[in-house]
Amino acid sequence: MTKASVLIATLGGQPQVVTFALDALLAQNEEITAVYVIHLSLDNLRTRQALTRVQQEFAGDQYAGRRCRLRRVPILLAGAPLADIHDEAGAEATGQTMRTLLGDLKRDGERLHLCLSGGRRMMALLALSAAALLCDHQDRIWHLYTPDAVRQQAAGGALMHVAPAAGVQLIQTPIVPWG
């Protein structure tokens, strides 16, 4: 088994992105001890429902019979949850959230898996930028590929887990870290 690590996932309205990615990592014998879900304001009904659905999978800091804690990371602007990334201030707040989270986890010696397939594209772009600065060669950045038929069946968290034969795959995103 590999060194313990954490999963960081961006979240929008599709909660299964988090569990599909985590299931794929566990199937690769990764020991994931925590999942950090980065999200915009819970005033958005889809985001709130998605987070609630993800939280149901982590009752008692357990996931699929393993100890794994879920931590939510809201994006804040001036101390308030950011509703959406519609201007430069929102982009800066999102980037700062990404840099702070990744920096804190790296200072704690964590090995990171980043799944950037959920939520707004800008969240993924800013997380990728932070990863280039703060991650090292032991960290991994992933895109979650979900076949169209599975995506339709799983929409909104209707399916939170699928069999390997369903074709859901993590695709490693090449990045040369500066850190």
Regions found by a protein language model. Give the residues of each.
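Long, low-complexity, Lys/Arg-enriched
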Residues: 1-112, 125-179
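Conserved SAM-binding loop
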Residues: 116
